[in-house]
Amino acid sequence: MNILMALSQLEVTGAEVYGVTLSNELIKRGNNVTIVSDTLTKKFDGEYIKIEFNKRGLFQRINQVISLLKIIKEKDIQVVHAHSRASSWSCEIACKIAKIPLITTTHGRQPVHLSRKIFKAFGRETITVCENIKKHLINELGVDKNKIKVLRNPIDTSYYPFVYSDLKKDNKIVSIIGRLSGPKGEVAYKVLETLENVSNISIQVIGGKEIPEKFNKFLNKSNIKFLGYVNDIPEKIKNSDLVIGAGRVGVEAILSGKPLIAIGEAQYIGLVSPDNLIPAL
């Protein structure tokens, strides 16, 4: 099958990791996969074509649709799979013109406004990564529940062997993993404010293409390091005593045997235990 994956991130996100992981597995199984996106950082085994979906002016949207139709025709694309609001808008129109199916994956909560309810752009079928997002789409955006399936983040578990943490050592390494923009950035900022003066904790902040100005107050703290984007997330999780994050990062931490404080954009779970594992997922 010839598949087109559409992303729109400006920095590495869970959606990119999801999309690339899925695409590489589809290629291994004999499919042809092309990715279109504003940027692409993770290693991808197929062809990447740049389309700047975050440029949302009318003429830019028209150019995006034209580019998509050209790719669909040249590569004989049979299905498009979009992973973001920005990309799904243009893909919805292109797929209707080309008369091919659009599948979408919703990785997080969506803005609720009238235009989103009128022009949903969720495709023929939509996938959500958890039950809470499914409920959100049904109750707040009016998406047909029969067109939604829950499929959790695809993770190669061979990268995340279970290793017990040594909680008796004096200095603990706390890893905050996620981008520093948007709601996740607000969460990271509040966590750093809370922990910055705790003497026996070393904090590593992983993720974020650039450090927002408001985080500058933490740059001179000897116990806080901003590592930016790193390729060896499994190794960083392995060397952590506590992970703070959400989404696929949370699942990766649990698989690795690391204590996890789950803080998402819309919900605070806290320290994940057997008692709250199901709602955390």
Placement of each model-derived feature along the sequence:
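Nucleotide-sugar donor-binding and catalytic loop/hinge architecture
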Residues: 1, 161-173
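Nucleotide-activated donor-binding/catalytic signature segment of Leloir-type glycosyltransferases, i.e.
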Residues: 207, 212-230
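Catalytic binding pocket for nucleotide-activated donors in carbohydrate/polymer assembly enzymes
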Residues: 251-281
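N-terminal strand-loop element at the rim of the active site
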Residues: 5-60, 208-215
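Short His-centered aromatic/hydrophobic patch
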Residues: 82-88, 106
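Acidic donor-binding loop of glycosyltransferase active sites
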Residues: 77-79, 235-251, 257-261
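Conserved catalytic-core segment of nucleotide-activated headgroup transferases in glycan assembly
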Residues: 170-211
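Carbohydrate-associated surface elements
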Residues: 132, 154
